[in-house]
Amino acid sequence: MFVDQVKIYVKGGDGGNGMVAFRREKYVPKGGPAGGDGGKGGDVVFKVDEGLSTLMDFRYQRHFKAARGEHGMSKNQHGRNAEDMVVKVPPGTVVIDDDTKQVIADLTEHGQEAVIAKGGRGGRGNTRFATPANPAPQLSENGEPGKERYIVLELKVLADVGLVGFPSVGKSTLLSVVSSAKPKIADYHFTTLNPNLGMVETEDGRSFVMADLPGLIEGAHEGVGLGHQFLRHIERTRVIVHVIDMSGLEGRDPYEDYVTINKELEQYNLRLTERPQIIVANKMDMPDAEENLKAFKEKLTDDYPVFPISAVTRQGLRDLLFEIADRLETTPEFPLYDEEDMAENRVMYKLEDEEAPFEISRDPDGTFVLSGAKLERLFKMTDFSRDESVKRFARQLRGMGVDDALRARGAKDGDTIRLLEFEFEFID
């Protein structure tokens, strides 16, 4: 089964917790703190595997969580970093953040990797908090939570050439006679529901990958007839081969078909019009085909080459394949996404987090609710079982201006403050 879109959940591993420990050794009085740091959590890494061709595996496993780092130990022993979770994806996979709809990674080459969810750093042990004023600190940090997000995976097939056109114009038949691909062929519309790839080789030894894409209909750019699902596979092709049925057996006007399909391509993605297009007048072995082709050329205003062929009798295929190979030699690849934009979307903590470290809202019951990525991160890294850790967290809140902001919002002694699932009293 061909699967080309799926939504999954990924989470980097949490960092290991830091340790509160002290050196206890004979003849060494007041040995001092000796708690080690926690290890880093594992990253969730996507890696391209050219042996895969579909996202089928993700239908059965939709949650990916990397291992957490090992906790710190006594004698200043640091916890081991967790191994990364490597998830294999097929070439042509686009990773999109489900919340922001921004592209995180475009994975096209075998072995290419991208960190999708970064693991948290390990918490610091009490050795890190020793100062002249507090040489034996009773506090440590919990590990930093790993990044978590819902993402959408889209598979856009990797092909040099894309066959486009209305249903039943002969795209699958054409692919089957110029390559060893065996697409399903029948005399009804939408026989092809999934892209079929075939390797084509010309007589002079040049080769390229051709994709038979499912038939399009009017309104495809708006999703009509599974249009979005089909159109996404055209985006990576360098040359578009527009197959048109010249027989007129279904009562359609070949030129109207041509105009309709090109309009759908343009409205789906304007950049598709930048690609070279070759018009294939198919089914020239049928009785009215020559007359229809003549009328088509009279109406055609675009400067695209027209190749009359018959996929069934193989008439005209040699010249067509040579033209496609020639066009590919002079046509560069069309990158779908900007590399810098994708790199920015993979960053864990952006500048915006520093500009707005917290927000304050108020529930109907009068409770003040604190939120914000930085604030929640500090909260999760605090060990509330130790008084010194709690006091440190209170100092951090004051340093961030939380106390002053609460007073400005009208908070008074005894008011309830909520942060995530934790509630505490405001003391002025």
UniProtKB/Swiss-Prot annotation:
Keyword Cytoplasm among record annotations: yes
Q: Which SUPFAM superfamilies match?
A: Obg GTP-binding protein C-terminal domain (SSF102741), Obg GTP-binding protein N-terminal domain (SSF82051), P-loop containing nucleoside triphosphate hydrolases (SSF52540)
Q: Using the record's annotation, list all stretches that form the OBG-type G domain.
A: 159-329
Keyword annotations of the record: Cytoplasm, GTP-binding, Hydrolase, Magnesium, Metal-binding, Nucleotide-binding
Q: What is its EC number?
A: 3.6.5.-
Q: What class of enzyme is it?
A: hydrolase
Residues annotated to bind Mg(2+): 172, 192
Region ranges (Disordered) = 118-143
- Where in the numbering of this chain does the Obg domain appear? 1-158
Where is the protein localized? Cytoplasm
Question: What InterPro entries does UniProt report for this protein, alphabetically?
Answer: G_OBG, GTP-bd, GTP-bd_Obg/CgtA, GTP-bd_prot_GTP1/OBG_C_sf, GTP1-OBG_CS, GTP1_OBG_dom, GTP1_OBG_dom_sf, OBG_GTPase
Give residue ranges for domain OCT: 350-428
Q: Which Pfam family, any one, appears in the UniProt record?
A: GTP1_OBG
Its needed co-factors are: Mg(2+)
Q: Which residues bind GTP?
A: 165-172, 190-194, 212-215, 282-285, 310-312
Residues spanning the membrane:
none
Q: Which Gene Ontology BP annotations are present?
A: ribosome biogenesis
Q: What does UniProt give as GO cellular component?
A: cytoplasm
Write out the GO MF terms.
Answer: GTP binding; GTPase activity; magnesium ion binding
Cross-referenced NCBIfam families, in alphabetical order? Obg_CgtA, Obg_CgtA_exten, PRK12296.1, PRK12297.1, PRK12299.1, small_GTP
**What role does it play?**
An essential GTPase which binds GTP, GDP and possibly (p)ppGpp with moderate affinity, with high nucleotide exchange rates and a fairly low GTP hydrolysis rate. Plays a role in control of the cell cycle, stress response, ribosome biogenesis and in those bacteria that undergo differentiation, in morphogenesis control.
Q: Which family does it belong to?
A: Belongs to the TRAFAC class OBG-HflX-like GTPase superfamily. OBG GTPase family.
Q: How does it assemble?
A: Monomer.
UniProt protein name: GTPase Obg
Give the organism the record lists: Bacillus licheniformis (strain ATCC 14580 / DSM 13 / JCM 2505 / CCUG 7422 / NBRC 12200 / NCIMB 9375 / NCTC 10341 / NRRL NRS-1264 / Gibson 46)
